[in-house]
Amino acid sequence: MSCLMVERCGEILFENPDQNAKCVCMLGDIRLRGQTGVRAERRGSYPFIDFRLLNSTTYSGEIGTKKKVKRLLSFQRYFHASRLLRGIIPQAPLHLLDEDYLGQARHMLSKVGMWDFDIFLFDRLTNGNSLVTLLCHLFNTHGLIHHFKLDMVTLHRFLVMVQEDYHSQNPYHNAVHAADVTQAMHCYLKEPKLASFLTPLDIMLGLLAAAAHDVDHPGVNQPFLIKTNHHLANLYQNMSVLENHHWRSTIGMLRESRLLAHLPKEMTQDIEQQLGSLILATDINRQNEFLTRLKAHLHNKDLRLEDAQDRHFMLQIALKCADICNPCRIWEMSKQWSERVCEEFYRQGELEQKFELEISPLCNQQKDSIPSIQIGFMSYIVEPLFREWAHFTGNSTLSENMLGHLAHNKAQWKSLLPRQHRSRGSSGSGPDHDHAGQGTESEEQEGDSP
């Protein structure tokens, strides 16, 4: 069947009138819709542009042969097996709130600005739809639906797309993590030092970036993608590979859903670029870059939040804090996140062992204990950033609360260290594994949270 490439939005328009279909080929988002009854299929890692790149690029004297592509796609099949079935297996209808839990979920939403908000309980009460339910509520609470004249049905459709593009089989990088980061971002946007300067656009950007910052995460870090010569690593030339993919996936879904199609073109382009800047800031490999800039601004007292660029920088910092705030939650929730992220690390280690690859730092369950990983992550990544955030907020109640939880949780993990490690502290998770212990999206292995 012949097809005509169209530049705008990466669309493919089929010339055959009987197959009047539109295929949106943005990276991270492919769907086929038409009158032929073909069921929509979302395949985050199979964009058309990726195949072109693989088939036309030479690496280490190797041409993109069919054999090489087949080897690369074998890793994709491993990661996305369940996702490839989404277009085949009918899905149960999505219910925002199960009737049995409606009252409890609504009660929780009334306290969504509290730092002890239990996202795990909320996810259960919403029948696994915590991200969609939370974002719909926050968009309404912040007046974004009215201000930007958003269609509620279209907003819901977009949020469902985002939620479904997270991999539920990932212990850590899943839609619940996205909801947790979004709830944290909501709390940070309410900080008095920041809130009085924020525009509706700032708030919408912050919430959207938080919700989609890890979309279509494969459950492995950037070094893994590089050493397996994954097509995404080739596409982004080993630079912020996962973050770039999250951003492009988000833009693809925004365009497909047409959530912002009624806004001026210049405005939507600006939104897309700012979303990219925010999501790319979560690359743990850029931690020192942002921390140094923040320290300099605070030392020089030259932050002018009336200025859009300075506000955007603080939104980047807020998102970075939200992304790695797990150690600053109450122990019961922080511990769950720590166990989840380490389980994801260990799974990567098992995969590397299976394919006879060198096991990445923090991914060897026999050598890297959860306490040592978490202590290193807190010491090298979390504490430095949150101390500066507290400085920015003027040691607000929330900042003091977070630092208190952080100190308590670190002490808890130290008490759980294997005896032979206690005298010399943690075995060292440095800013190595992405997030040093978490992550890096670029390492991302959690950069995300410990």
Swiss-Prot record:
Coiled coil: none
This protein's UniProt keywords: cAMP, Hydrolase, Metal-binding, Phosphoprotein
Biased composition annotated in UniProt, kind: Acidic residues: 441-450
Catalyzed reaction equations: 3',5'-cyclic AMP + H2O = AMP + H(+)
One GO BP annotation of this record: chemical synaptic transmission
Residues at the active site: 173
CDD domains, per the entry: HDc
Pathway: Purine metabolism; 3',5'-cyclic AMP degradation; AMP from 3',5'-cyclic AMP: step 1/1
Cellular compartments per GO CC: cytosol; synapse
All residue ranges annotated as the PDEase domain in the record: 97-420
Top-level taxonomic group: Eukaryota
Enzyme class: hydrolase
Region (Disordered): 418-450
Residue numbers binding a divalent metal cation 1: 177, 213-214, 323
UniProt comment concerning the protein's domains: Composed of a C-terminal catalytic domain containing two putative divalent metal sites and an N-terminal regulatory domain.
Role of this protein: Hydrolyzes the second messenger cAMP, which is a key regulator of many important physiological processes. May be involved in the control of cAMP-mediated neural activity and cAMP metabolism in the brain.
Name of the protein in its database record: 3',5'-cyclic-AMP phosphodiesterase 7B
Organism of origin: Homo sapiens
Originating gene: PDE7B
